[in-house]
Amino acid sequence: MSLNMFWFLPTHGDGHYLGTEEGSRPVDHGYLQQIAQAADRLGYTGVLIPTGRSCEDAWLVAASMIPVTQRLKFLVALRPSVTSPTVAARQAATLDRLSNGRALFNLVTGSDPQELAGDGVFLDHSERYEASAEFTQVWRRLLLGETVDFNGKHIHVRGAKLLFPPIQQPYPPLYFGGSSDVAQELAAEQVDLYLTWGEPPELVKEKIEQVRAKAAAHGRKIRFGVRLHVIVRETNDEAWQAAERLISHLDDETIAKAQAAFARTDSVGQQRMAALHNGKRDNLEISPNLWAGVGLVRGGAGTALVGDGPTVAARINEYAALGIDSFVLSGYPHLEEAYRVGELLFPHLDVAIPEIPQPQPLNPQGEAVANDFIPRNVAQS
């Protein structure tokens, strides 16, 4: 099975070390463009663009990278409760059309009540997933070309429709990650690819089996992906030394502050990440070559595969054997590590190198009439 390898655009900051200004660098458009172009040339399938108040806006960043890349896809966040499904569907179709079918979407429900309140969202965990399920149903139907009337608990639309369809049919693929039962149910019923953070393989296997069974109950099959950091070097010793350097400027106070911030979230996945290290520096290798040091101060994906190319490739293939076909990777700093992964790791894997998409012909059309419909030629009788 060929593997889809993704990279990451660090719109929330980048540098040589975690938890410090030491070795950091400005993250401006030129730097993000360098990373995107490197990923494009090296054969990555796409890039994940993060979302949240600590990040630049993912949609604007993605749009700005379209003209400077050729085949790279952009995995961009959909934010239920923050954006209406109709507006999000229009944005999705436009991004897909402007990129010639290079748009992918990542459903993000949110997990930090403090940040959500700042965005005007006051739903609890269960309510957010209810809203996300309704949002996704409407979003998908709109991209399928339906005119939608929907009266749910959280979402109400009447006569919603898109005038401009996406390039990818039936719609651009929808990614999603969540560890709670309600999150897995949403994934099983509505998404195309279920993402998990990089837990030890035995825990990932349990998740995949649970989601696969839930999807089968809905008569569906979905794909699987994993989100990981990577520290790959020419030798295993060099890789482990690089891992230690990454956290060499971290102090206990910074770790404690980060863990306190993570503790206020209601994300089951974040709780599972924190349990892998319990906020302590010792015993960070939680599974062979799987290191939890990143999660001491970084929210979300907090583990890294560490080793030389053949070693890391063997661990990736262990995940692939569980049914995972997509790997969303990152490393610090992201420009240099994009090259290291491409040069030291890719030769040891069966990597699916994307082709440059051919321009898709679009039907000619006149200006929309009354902001309501596209004029079509009428056959003369």
UniProtKB/Swiss-Prot annotation:
Extra remark beyond the main annotation: FMNH(2) which is absolutely required for this enzymatic reaction, is provided by SsuE.
Give one Pfam hit by family name.
Bac_luciferase
- Protein name (record): Alkanesulfonate monooxygenase
Q: Which CDD domains does the protein's record reference?
A: Alkanesulfonate_monoxygenase (cd01094)
Assembly and partners? Homotetramer.
GO terms assigned for molecular function: alkanesulfonate monooxygenase activity
The record's family statement is: Belongs to the SsuD family.
Supply the SUPFAM superfamilies for this chain: Bacterial luciferase-like
Alphabetically list the UniProt keywords: Flavoprotein, FMN, Monooxygenase, Oxidoreductase
Keyword Acetylation found: no
In which organism is this protein found?
Answer: Escherichia coli O81 (strain ED1a)
The reaction(s) catalysed by this protein are: an alkanesulfonate + FMNH2 + O2 = an aldehyde + FMN + sulfite + H2O + 2 H(+)
Which NCBIfam families does this chain map to?
Answer: alk_sulf_monoox, PRK00719.1
Enzyme Commission number(s) of this protein: 1.14.14.5
